Each structure stands twice: as C-alpha cells, then as structure tokens.
UniProtKB/Swiss-Prot annotation:
Residues 134-234 form the BACK domain. CDD domains: BACK_BTBD19 (cd18494), BTB_POZ_BTBD19 (cd18294). PANTHER family: BTB/POZ DOMAIN-CONTAINING PROTEIN 19, BTB_POZ DOMAIN-CONTAINING PROTEIN 19. It comes from the Eukaryota. This is BTB/POZ domain-containing protein 19. The lineage of its organism: Eukaryota, Metazoa, Chordata, Craniata, Vertebrata. Disulfide bonds: none annotated. SUPFAM superfamilies: POZ domain (SSF54695). Gene3D superfamilies: 1.25.40.420, Potassium Channel Kv1.1, Chain A (3.30.710.10). InterPro entries: BACK, BTB/POZ_dom, BTBD19, SKP1/BTB/POZ_sf. Residues 29-98 form the BTB domain. PROSITE patterns: BTB (PS50097).
C-alpha cells in the first residue's frame, strides 16, 4: 500500500513577489481593461482573475476571438482602486491607503470579494478621522454595511461640530444624514444643527438643480425646533420666509410646545434634548431630557 502523501510548503514571499510582478504587466497578459474616467489601460490574465473572482469569471467567460481582443471597459472604478483589487487577486494581500481605501472597499463590494471587503473595513476603522468619517458613512449606507455605519455614527456623535464642517458632510445623501439627525448623542446644539442642515440642503439644491426645501424635505423633520429659545425660533421663522427650508407646520408645532410648556405635547423626539444641547430657560418645562 502506497504511503499517504504529505503536503509541504515552500516560502510564500518569493511566490507572492513573483505574482505581484505580473500585476498590470503586459507580458503574457491576455486581457486589457480600460479603467476609470482617465481610460487608463490595465493588463491582466484571464485565468487568474476567473479562478479568483466570480465577477470576473462571468465578465471574461467567453473566449476571446482571433486577433487582438477588445479591451474591457470599467469606467466607474478608479485606476488606483482597480490595481489594488488586482494586487489582492494575484497575491491575496494588498497595500491600503487612507485616501483610496473607500474606493477599494466599494470595488470589493461590487465585485463580491468578501475577504478584501473585510480587510478594507478593518483598515477604515483604524484610520477613521473627522475628514474621512462622513465619506465612510456614505459608503456604509449605500452598501448596507451596518457595523461600519454604527462606527461612523458613533464617531460623529463624539466629534459632531468638527464633522459638520467637513465637505463630506455636505455631500451626504439624505439616507446617510437621517441616522445622524435622529441621534440623541450628537455633541452639538440644535441651532448649529439647523445651520448645518441648511448648508447641506443648499449644496444639494445646487447639484440637483432643485429647490432647497425639496432637497431638505426628507431630513428636516428630524430637527428638534422646540429646543430653540423663542427668539431663536422667531429668527428661524423669518429666515424660513426668505429661504424656505422647514415646513411651516413643523415650526407651528415648536411654538405649541412653547405655549403649552409641556414636552409631552411634542410627542417625544421633537422636544428631547441631545447630548450637546445648550441649556435654555424653557427647557425646565420639557419632560424629556437627554438620558
């Protein structure tokens, strides 16, 4: 009886280095991608991509015809991110950078590369900062990455004022902004949050070529106007006449809370203080303080 064989392993580093040398190497390549808005050519090897990734197996499933095959156009993925994907597929390792990791994460999700996705998520959590967090939140909401969304919301809750001043905040979708405005733990006063929401809506209105109030409609209902002092509410009402942002009915409800001096009349959240809410004289009448 023939004895059982034994699998022995050589050194992984030379093998990985040899495969890494094939990334975007036209020598022996049999497929060319045209990548990103810059339409940069990237060279690869069909058999390797197909055996490592179902997305490429489907994309490259048909045999190339005679002659020079046509390039495969992938216009939505940035070149740097695509090269990182190839590096991972060839070597099962990848060098990630803070400035491009969200693009690599997006590609990993779209191509169904779960291991690369997890590596990117771990890296994002390690490098998360004020400038990156809103962009990361947008990616998390777009692709349903629940744990990353929770991490981002918690980070913004702790660094609210700084995060609200970033470009990433102004570029959030309404769906990504909603979990922030619903949070009791934001370390920011409501007056500043109203100003941030207005700035966000103005940017969206300019990009989408729609009225500010229309852009703001999905999110402004989460603003807790009853927390504002009467003078602040009057000023907001006047500004709202000049540049509509908040439905008149919502402002009326805030005035009702002042008139009745009972927080429960606002039915919960509209009168509930956030962690960063500055104290005002009328808050002593509100039943629902921050917990």
């Amino acid at each position: 009886m023939e004895p059982l064989g034994l699998v022995v392993h050589g050194k992984a580093e030379p093998f990985s280095a040899a495969l890494r040398s094939l990334v975007n190497n036209p020598r022996y390549s049999d497929v060319c991608f045209v990548v990103g808005q810059e339409r940069q050519e990237v060279f690869a090897h069909r058999c390797l991509l197909a055996c490592r990734c179902n997305f490429f197996q489907r994309l490259l499933g048909t045999e190339p015809g005679p002659g020079v095959p046509s390039p495969v156009v992938l216009s939505t993925v940035p070149t740097e991110a695509f090269l990182a994907v190839l590096e991972f597929l060839y070597t099962n390792s990848v060098k990630l950078y803070r400035h491009s990791v969200l693009e690599v994460l997006t590609a990993a999700v779209e191509y169904g590369l779960e291991e690369l996705r997890e590596l990117c998520l771990q890296f994002v959590v390690k490098v998360l900062d004020v400038d990156l967090v809103c962009e990361a939140l947008q990616v998390a909401v777009t692709f349903g990455l629940g744990q990353l969304q929770e991490r981002c919301v918690a980070f913004i809750e702790a660094h609210s004022q700084e995060a609200l001043r970033t470009r990433g905040f102004l570029e959030l979708s309404a769906a990504a902004l909603l979990p922030l405005l619903r949070s009791d733990k934001l370390c920011v006063d409501e007056a500043e949050l109203v100003r941030a929401a207005r700035s966000w809506a103005r940017v969206g209105a300019a990009v989408l070529e729609r009225p500010v109030a229309e852009v703001a409609a999905p999110v402004v209902k989460e603003l807790r106007l009853a927390l504002l002092a009467p003078a602040e509410l009057s000023a907001l009402e006047e500004q709202n006449r000049q540049e509509p942002l908040i439905p008149v009915e919502q402002i009326v409800e805030a005035w009702k809370c002042h008139a009745l001096r009972r927080g429960d009349e606002a039915r919960g959240a509209p009168c509930r203080r956030r962690r960063g809410t500055l104290p005002r004289e009328h808050h002593r009448f509100l039943d629902l303080s921050f917990k």
